[in-house]
Amino acid sequence: LAQRAGITIDAKGAQLNQREQELRDRIRACNREAARYFFRSLTQDDAGGVGRAYLLNERGLSMAAVRHFGLGYAKPESFGLVNYLRDKGFTDDEMITANLAYQSKTGHVMDRFRDRIMYPIFDTVGNVIAFGGRALNKEDKAKYINTNTTPVFRKSNNLYGYNFARKAHSDHLILAEGYMDVIALQTAGFAGAVASLGTSLTE
């Protein structure tokens, strides 16, 4: 058809675009499995007791809210998520590209999020594209660790909670400060509550 129409197709470019799309699909799938792992760690594992205590007792959330927002817990293990994702068929490179793992100086691929409450970040259609992780250990120097730029996520282009606001057909948005503020507002009936993920917003 292209020949008949006199159109030249860039085969290399098409192959590159296909590889990029396949990588994005794999990163989204990797994030989805990671979210399941974090959620089960929070709601079912004994190790998740500290996370449940923080969310349910200290912050006053209900289990319904935990489920709705897909909250989770990253256990204080070095290889828990890495081993889980390997068992699910994901490669070390995919985990590192998704910013879920990193390679240590000794060459080991290790979990990036440890002993943290995990807030999955969704795109507008509900795909998990990133995470925010809040430290539970008060001595941890980094209170929050967030996913860096990946093939599926750029923090300045996304809003936390926007997928839920969009699904609720909210006709206006309320810009809140952080994850828990969005959860509290939306749970209280303010469906348009969202939070920025960077220091500035794009148009």
Language-model features: locations:
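Phosphate-handling DNA/RNA-contact segment within nucleic-acid enzymes
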Residues: 1-3, 16-34, 75-203
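Aromatic-rich juxtamembrane segments at the membrane interface
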Residues: 70-72
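Generic secondary-structure signature for well-ordered alpha-helical cores
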Residues: 3-6, 43
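Charged, low-hydrophobicity low-complexity segments
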Residues: 8-14
